A protein has these predicted regions:
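Cap/lid and interdomain-hinge subdomains that line or gate substrate/regulatory clefts
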Residues: 2-9, 34-37, 47, 63, ...
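Residues that scaffold, gate, or flank divalent-cation-dependent active/transport sites
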Residues: 24-32, 40
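Short gly/pro/ser/thr-enriched loop/turn and capping motifs at secondary-structure boundaries
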Residues: 41-43, 118-122, 217-220, 242-243
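Short, structured active-site "lid" loops
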Residues: 50-67
Length: 264
């Protein structure tokens, strides 16, 4: 690292603006200092760096080149922090190409892919992506005009853009996998608890692993690395709309009836 630059404890590389901010918010809410960067070279002292590559809709080769270029400005390869590749939970984008480029740039030989986001209805079952109980190839995401999803099998999608071996794995297998040759493992997850176990296994691994996932895995890392509990939020919401005032007047003139259900 250059003199005067503090190495982050977590580095997130997202492929779009929304994903970058999602990841940053999750980690900021539990006490991390977070910087979201959109241009290189970037230098900062936050504990979490979130880099937006804005490469989701790019040609795969150009997306890989963008990742390589971004990482060349971040001197982390010799001793990388926890590195998260933030992807879309519905598998849109250049997942395989960007995973390979990031692994090479960070000197990491293993990647764990867990794109599930249970809170949004996105789960991984038997290596396939499901959305609200429907296989993703049977949803509107299959016909996305920019980045259509061609298969429900996550490993198949990744293999379209990389020659690195990719296959389903389990959390228990992570501690036994070889680090001599590059590999990519896809892990099932249907609940936040599943993602918590995946995040814990990656963060405790004997050698650095690339953690690949959506907002769900970023939330799991936030829970695992929390510096302080999320703050209580009070929202006070008002409206200057004339329609709101009219509705309030109607409500004030409308009789209110109370029924004691204990007598029913």
């Amino acid at each position: 690292m250059e003199k005067g630059i503090t190495k982050p404890s977590i580095l997130v590389v997202a492929d779009d603006f929304t994903g970058a901010n999602d990841a940053g918010v999750s980690l900021a809410q539990v006490g991390h200092t977070v910087d979201v960067a959109f241009e290189m070279p970037y230098r900062g002292d936050a504990s979490v760096w979130v880099i937006n590559s804005d490469s989701r809709a790019m040609d795969p080769k150009l997306a890989a080149m963008k990742i390589t270029s971004l990482m060349s400005n971040l001197p982390l390869a010799n001793n990388p922090p926890l590195v998260i590749k933030k992807i879309d939970s519905t598998l849109r984008g250049n997942i395989g190409a960007e995973i390979e480029a990031l692994m090479k740039a960070c000197g990491i030989t293993g990647a764990v892919v867990a794109p599930a986001f249970p809170q949004a209805g996105r789960t991984t079952v038997a290596g396939e992506c499901w959305v609200n109980g429907v296989r993703i190839t049977e949803t509107e995401f299959a016909s996305d005009p920019k980045t259509p999803v061609l298969s429900a099998r996550i490993a198949d999608i990744i293999r379209l853009q990389t020659a690195i071996p990719c296959q389903p794995v389990t959390v228990s297998q992570l501690s036994h996998l070889s680090y001599e040759q590059p590999w990519i493992g896809v892990i099932d997850a249907q609940t936040d608890s599943d993602l918590d176990r995946i995040a814990a296994a990656v963060m405790q691994a004997k050698q650095p692993l690339l953690l690949v996932g959506s907002a769900g895995i970023c939330d799991a890392v936030a829970r695992r690395s929390a510096i302080m509990p999320p703050p209580t939020v009070l929202a006070i919401i008002g409206s200057m709309s004339g329609n709101r005032s009219t509705a309030d007047r109607h409500t004030s003139f409308t009789p209110t009836y109370h029924t004691d259900i204990r007598r029913c």
